[in-house]
Amino acid sequence: MKILVTGAKGFVGKNLCCQLNNIKEGKARCYGDLQVDEVFEYDIDSTPEQLDSWCGECDFVFNLAGVNRPKDNDEFMKGNFGFASTLLDTLKKHNNTCPVMLSSSQQASLTGRFGNSEYGRSKKAGEDLFLEYGKETGAKVLVYRFPNLYGKWCRPNYNSAIATFCNNIANDLPIQVNDRSVQMEILYIDDLVEEMICALKGQEHHCEFEGLDVLPSAEGRYCYCPVTHKTTLGEIVDTIYECARAVRAVPDSTEGPSTALEMPQDSLRYRLMSTFLSYLPKEKAIFDLKMNVDPRGSFTELVHTLNCGQVSINISKPGITKGEHWHNSKWEQFIVVSGHGLIQMRKEGTDEVLNYEVSGDKIQSVIMLPGYTHNIINLSETEDLVTVMYCNEVFNPERPDTYFDKVEK
C-alpha cells in the first residue's frame, strides 16, 4: 500500500509518518498483515509535480495539511479549503478514487464558543467539499473532527495549551492560566495515530455529531477517535506539576499515585507524563541518586512501590562480605549482574550452610528465605560485584525486621 500524507511535517503528520514508516520497515509488528510500501510525505516545501505524481500512485490519503495561526483570517479559507480543493482535483485528474481522510476540528461544529470561528468555517467548508467529493466519485471519505491535541513534538506557544504548559514547566518558566474551570476534551497523539491505522485497515469508527457531542453510529458520515479524555484546565496543570515533581527522583508510589509506577497505560496521567518528559531539557534528563557509600562499596535504592517492595543496586568491593543478617517475614532476591560472588544462607538454629556461586556471566536470582541468615561475598580480588536486590517491602527504619547473625560461626 502506498500512502500520501499531506502536512507531513506538522505535529500530527510527523507522528503519523513515523509510525507508518515503522510499519513499512518492519519495526512495528502489532498491526497484523498491514503492509506499507511507500509513504509519500507532502508538505509546504514539496512541489506541485510531486503532489501530481503521488496522487496518481497512492492507495490512501491522509490530508492533514492546514492553517492554524495565520496572519489574517483570509488565510484560513485559502489554507484549509483551497488546498483541499487542489488535492481532490488532482485525485480526480488521475481517476484515483482511493480512500481519503480529512483532518477537521471540533470548531467546524460552529456551535457554542465556536459559533463565530473563521477557522471553524474554513474547516466546515473543507468537510463539505470532501463529503461532496465522496458522493461524486464514490471514493471512501473519512472526516475526523479532532478535539484539542497534545503529545510529543507538539509545538509550544502555538495552538496547544498543553504543549505550552509542558514546555514552560519543564524549563522553569511561568505559565498563565486564566480560568482553571474551563472544560476541555483532549486527544493524545498516540491514540490519534492508532485510529489512523484503524482507518487504513478499514476499521475506522463512524459517528454523527450533535454540536460537540459524538454520537457513535456505524452509518455516520463522520469519524472519531474513541479514546479521549474530558477534564478541566486546572486538573491538567496540576497533573503536569505533579509529573515535574516526580521526574527527578527515585520512582516512589508509597505516598500516592504521582509516579509512573502508579499510572495505568489507559490513564490521562500516563499520557501527560509521557508528553511532559518529551519537553525536558538536556540537563534535566540526568540526575543523581542517593548513594549510601562506605569502604565496602555502595547501596543505592532505585524504585519504591506501594505494595510491591523496592529495588536497589548493591556494589561490593573485591573480597568484601555484606549481609550477615536474617528477617522474620520479609524476603529478598539477589541478582548478580557483574562480577563473581558467593551467596550463603543458613537456617536459624541449624548449622548447615547453603552455598550459591553466582556471576554476571549467567544471570540467576537467589531468594533470601525468611528465617535464614544470609550474606553475599565478592570472590574477586580485582573487580566489583554488582548485584540487583529486590525486597518485597520498602525498608522501614522503625521496623527493619533485620537481625545480625553471621552465616558461618
Question: Language-model features: where?
Answer:
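Conserved Rossmann-fold NAD(P)-dependent oxidoreductase catalytic core, especially the SDR/UDP-sugar
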Residues: S85-E127, G134-T137, L142-Y144
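Mid/C-terminal beta-alpha module of Rossmann-like enzyme folds, strongest
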Residues: C198, G202-K290
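N-terminal Rossmann NAD(P)H-binding glycine-rich loop of SDR-like oxidoreductase domains
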Residues: M1-G26
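Substrate-positioning beta->alpha
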Residues: P156-T164, S181-G202, H206-C207, G234-E235
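NAD(P)H-binding glycine-rich loop region in Rossmannoid oxidoreductase-like domains
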Residues: D43-T86, T90-H94, Q107-F114
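A conserved pocket-lining segment of Rossmann-fold NAD(P)-dependent short-chain dehydrogenase/reductase
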Residues: P147, T164-L187, C207, L215-C225
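Conserved beta-loop-beta element that borders a ligand/cofactor-binding pocket
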Residues: D128-W153, L173-V182, S217
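A short glycine-rich, His/Asp/Glu-containing loop-to-beta-strand
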Residues: K284-E324
